[in-house]
Amino acid sequence: MVHYKLVYFPLRARAEIARQIFAYAGQDYSEENLSFEQWPARKNNTPFGQLPILEVDGKPLGQSYAIARYLAREFGIAGQNDTEAAEVDAIADQFKDYLNDVSPYLTVLAGFKPGDKDQLRTDVFVPAFKKNFEFFENILASNHSGFFVGNSLTWVDLLISQHVQDILDKDLAVVEEFKKVLAHRKKVQSIDRIQKYIANRPDYPF
């Protein structure tokens, strides 16, 4: 039997997609959460000098999206065929571009760097959010299933619904115009195993 071990910090952030895939699949795994003080001593022993990593029977896999794609394939939520898998990947890659665009704001919001978060919200976050979530709103409108791709949940549904929840917790105004995105978040987080996972997960700051 395969043993999975997820290594990250005590945060949701980039490891949360893997955790939610495990929860959806009902798959047992272990987790090691490093403190920021422990991290420098472990950094050189990771594939790319960053976290998260997923150890699969002791073999480390780096990069959060690679981990998500691997687990999604293992547990049947990567898309029902190659075309769907490519569509899922395209949406995930667009979402990753969006996160890169808004990272200056999110980094200040989380307290990792100093900065004027109100100005960054106005100049950086809101324009990028509205641009990209209009794309996502239109994709949901054209698919008709309530999911981003096909007729069933894929890993990109978990990825984006969690981010929407994070934004709802901090900034309702920016997301409230995207009705299908909000309905999608509710649909995904109402899935029994995801709902139970969210109700019982640690209360990390982000």
From Swiss-Prot:
One of its GO terms (molecular function) is glutathione transferase activity. Its EC number is 2.5.1.18. Keywords: Transferase. Belongs to the GST superfamily. Sigma family. InterPro entries: Glutathione-S-Trfase_C-like, Glutathione-S-Trfase_C_sf, Glutathione_S-Trfase_N, GST_C, GST_superfamily, Thioredoxin-like_sf. Residues 81-206 form the GST C-terminal domain. Conjugation of reduced glutathione to a wide number of exogenous and endogenous hydrophobic electrophiles. Pfam families: GST_C_3, GST_N. CDD domains: GST_C_Sigma_like, GST_N_Sigma_like. It catalyses: RX + glutathione = an S-substituted glutathione + a halide anion + H(+). Signal peptide: none annotated. One of its GO terms (biological process) is innate immune response. The keyword Aminoacyl-tRNA synthetase does not apply. The keyword Transferase applies. This is Probable glutathione S-transferase 6. It comes from Caenorhabditis elegans. It is an enzyme of class 2 (transferase). It comes from the Eukaryota. Residues 2-79 form the GST N-terminal domain. Glutathione binds at Y8, W39, K43, G49, Q50, L51, Q63, S64.
